[in-house]
Amino acid sequence: MLLIAGLGNPGSHYQNNRHNIGFMAVDAIHEAFSFSPWSKKFQAEVSNGLINGEKILLIKPQTFMNLSGQAIGEALRFYKLDLDHLIVFYDELDLPPGTVRVKIGGRSNGHNGIKSIDSHCGNNYHHVRLGIGRPISKELVDQYVLGNFTQSDQKWLSTLLGVIANNVAMLIKGDSNCFMNKISLTMKSQGLQ
């Protein structure tokens, strides 16, 4: 079994925020495959399904971003899963919009959701960083990540979410380089990178 987490903040007020791109990625995966309806467990919304025969638990912590590790830690302990069975999708300021980078382990780079997971679980899991770009001024970071994606963002965003869902099986079988390459080629072929 693998646990695929998307980070974000709960509630309709935050639904379209840049900070919620992790939730959006997991929602796209949920829609692309025959997953169970969302239910509440582990201080999160969860859904079970199969991707290429692999059991998957999708999880969207409902604890707010800064406490995401509580929900993810509960789920890992309940299912007795090691960190190599955890994939986390989240927003990354230091990557251009529509860019994806996957790595195992590493630092939080100031991302409070990742800091929370690292403190509750450790950091040796699959980090899937989804580029949202960065505002011009450092003082505007909070306002930027908690701001909604703009109309001009919608084309690259919808394409990115679709290509993530269509190719997540590569990531699940451990081929993160092919996953990143497929996303990059798709985004570039459509002039979105």
UniProtKB/Swiss-Prot annotation:
<comment type="similarity">
    <text>Belongs to the PTH family.</text>
</comment>
<feature type="site" description="Stabilizes the basic form of H active site to accept a proton">
    <location>
        <position position="91"/>
    </location>
</feature>
<dbReference type="InterPro" id="IPR001328">
    <property type="entry name" value="Pept_tRNA_hydro"/>
</dbReference>
<dbReference type="GO" id="GO:0004045">
    <property type="term" value="F:peptidyl-tRNA hydrolase activity"/>
</dbReference>
<comment type="function">
    <text>Catalyzes the release of premature peptidyl moieties from peptidyl-tRNA molecules trapped in stalled 50S ribosomal subunits, and thus maintains levels of free tRNAs and 50S ribosomes.</text>
</comment>
<feature type="binding site">
    <location>
        <position position="112"/>
    </location>
    <ligand>
        <name>tRNA</name>
    </ligand>
</feature>
<feature type="binding site">
    <location>
        <position position="66"/>
    </location>
    <ligand>
        <name>tRNA</name>
    </ligand>
</feature>
<comment type="subunit">
    <text>Monomer.</text>
</comment>
<dbReference type="Pfam" id="PF01195">
    <property type="entry name" value="Pept_tRNA_hydro"/>
</dbReference>
<dbReference type="InterPro" id="IPR036416">
    <property type="entry name" value="Pept_tRNA_hydro_sf"/>
</dbReference>
<dbReference type="GO" id="GO:0005737">
    <property type="term" value="C:cytoplasm"/>
</dbReference>
<keyword id="KW-0963">Cytoplasm</keyword>
<dbReference type="InterPro" id="IPR018171">
    <property type="entry name" value="Pept_tRNA_hydro_CS"/>
</dbReference>
<feature type="binding site">
    <location>
        <position position="14"/>
    </location>
    <ligand>
        <name>tRNA</name>
    </ligand>
</feature>
<keyword id="KW-0694">RNA-binding</keyword>
<dbReference type="GO" id="GO:0072344">
    <property type="term" value="P:rescue of stalled ribosome"/>
</dbReference>
<feature type="binding site">
    <location>
        <position position="64"/>
    </location>
    <ligand>
        <name>tRNA</name>
    </ligand>
</feature>
<protein>
    <recommendedName>
        <fullName>Peptidyl-tRNA hydrolase</fullName>
        <ecNumber>3.1.1.29</ecNumber>
    </recommendedName>
</protein>
<dbReference type="GO" id="GO:0000049">
    <property type="term" value="F:tRNA binding"/>
</dbReference>
<comment type="function">
    <text>Hydrolyzes ribosome-free peptidyl-tRNAs (with 1 or more amino acids incorporated), which drop off the ribosome during protein synthesis, or as a result of ribosome stalling.</text>
</comment>
<keyword id="KW-0820">tRNA-binding</keyword>
<dbReference type="GO" id="GO:0006515">
    <property type="term" value="P:protein quality control for misfolded or incompletely synthesized proteins"/>
</dbReference>
<feature type="active site" description="Proton acceptor">
    <location>
        <position position="19"/>
    </location>
</feature>
<keyword id="KW-0378">Hydrolase</keyword>
<feature type="site" description="Discriminates between blocked and unblocked aminoacyl-tRNA">
    <location>
        <position position="9"/>
    </location>
</feature>
